[in-house]
Each structure stands twice: as C-alpha cells, then as structure tokens.
C-alpha cells in the first residue's frame, strides 16, 4: 500500500562474509550463522522467561484458562498485551533475519516462510518452544534432502506430506504432550 507492488531491496545487517570448512567444500554464510545463533538465544531466553518469571507463569495460566487465571488475581488484559508485544517483537526479528537472507522484498515475501514456521511449530508440538525449534530444523533437513535427492519442485509438497503423516501418527507433534481434559 505504501511502497507499491514493485520489489524493494533490503541491505543485510550482517554483511557479506562467510566461513569455509572442509577445505572450502562447506561454506556457511554470515547470515546463516547469525540467524542460528539468534534463534538459539531467543529460544533460551523465551523458555527461561515463560518458566521462571511471574509474567511467564501468568502467560501460561492465561493460555490454559482465562477465566480461572482472572479469578486467581492475574491481570488477563495486561498479560495478553505483553504476550502480543513479545510476539510482535519476535516477528520483527524474524522479518529482519529473513530479509537479510533474501534481500529482495515483495508483498508476498513472508507468506511461504510464515506457513513453514507454523508447520514447524505444529510438527514440533504446539506450546513447546524447543519443540518448535527442533521441528524447524527437522523440516529444514527434510526440505534440503528432498531438493537434493527427489525434486526441487516437490520439496514443499514433501514437507507438508511429512507434516500430515506426523499429525496422523502423533497429533500433538514430536515434543507435544497429550493432555486429556477432565469433565
């Protein structure tokens, strides 16, 4: 709406450096290294925040049962606002990292990475921060192997087929815990 539909370029915040391993047979770009390090750091901080702080406990309580959390003295509206702010901040960080890896911006730039991020969260287990990260890594490995050994055009379909298989076999995801509701 503001910039129109023509592609825009985004300069990388990391620069254009890389590390070569195994006599140059494996080249890892600086963007990849920074992205992996940032994801690990964010996962650790978010896990500690949600398990060790009052606000994290409040967030988990509100996500479980809003009414009961309110009756226990938790300010539900504030907790939802903080959760939304954290999610927005994480989305902004993800957007910057994505644009550093793929510097040409179009209106549809984030659609497939967004779908794959949701797929990784479901694959790893909704509600499990480490599960989402492990799900993302496994989906990335599946996608790379399918591109290398099967077909580059079918890699997305293969990733989603694996998701369907996982949901049929283990509906809670790889690290999700099945919780039966008491009536």
Model regions and ranges:
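Helix-loop-helix "hairpin" substructures at the membrane interface of multi-pass membrane proteins
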Residues: 25-105, 129-130, 134
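Hydrophobic transmembrane-helix microenvironments that flank and shape a buried ionizable site
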Residues: 36, 62, 113-116, 153, ...
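Hydrophobic/aromatic residues within transmembrane alpha-helices
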Residues: 68-69, 122, 138, 174
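Hydrophobic core segments of alpha-helical transmembrane domains in multi-pass membrane transport
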Residues: 1, 36-47, 88-94, 120, ...
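Transmembrane alpha-helical segments in multi-pass inner-membrane proteins
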Residues: 81-91, 101-161
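Hydrophobic aliphatic residue packing
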Residues: 62-63, 74-79, 96, 119-122, ...
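Short loop segments and helix-boundary regions at transmembrane helix junctions
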Residues: 1-7, 49-56, 61, 111-126, ...
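Transmembrane helix-bundle core of multi-pass membrane transporters
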Residues: 1-52, 79, 145, 150, ...
């Amino acid at each position: 709406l503001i910039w129109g539909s023509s592609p825009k370029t985004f300069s990388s915040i990391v620069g254009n450096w890389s590390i070569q391993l195994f006599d140059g047979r494996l080249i890892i770009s600086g963007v990849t290294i920074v992205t992996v390090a940032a994801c690990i750091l964010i996962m650790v901080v978010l896990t500690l925040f949600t398990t060790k702080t009052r606000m994290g406990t409040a967030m988990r309580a509100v996500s479980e049962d809003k009414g009961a959390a309110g009756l226990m003295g938790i300010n539900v509206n504030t907790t939802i606002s903080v959760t939304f702010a954290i999610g927005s901040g994480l989305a902004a960080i993800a957007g910057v990292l994505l644009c550093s890896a793929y510097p040409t911006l179009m209106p549809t730039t984030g659609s497939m990475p967004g779908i794959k991020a949701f797929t990784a969260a479901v694959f790893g287990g909704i509600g499990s921060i480490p599960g989402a990260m492990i799900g993302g890594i496994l989906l990335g490995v599946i996608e790379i192997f399918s591109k290398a050994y099967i077909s580059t055009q079918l890699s997305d379909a293969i990733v989603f087929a694996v998701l369907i298989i996982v949901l049929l076999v283990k509906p809670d995801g790889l690290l999700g815990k099945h919780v039966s509701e008491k009536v």
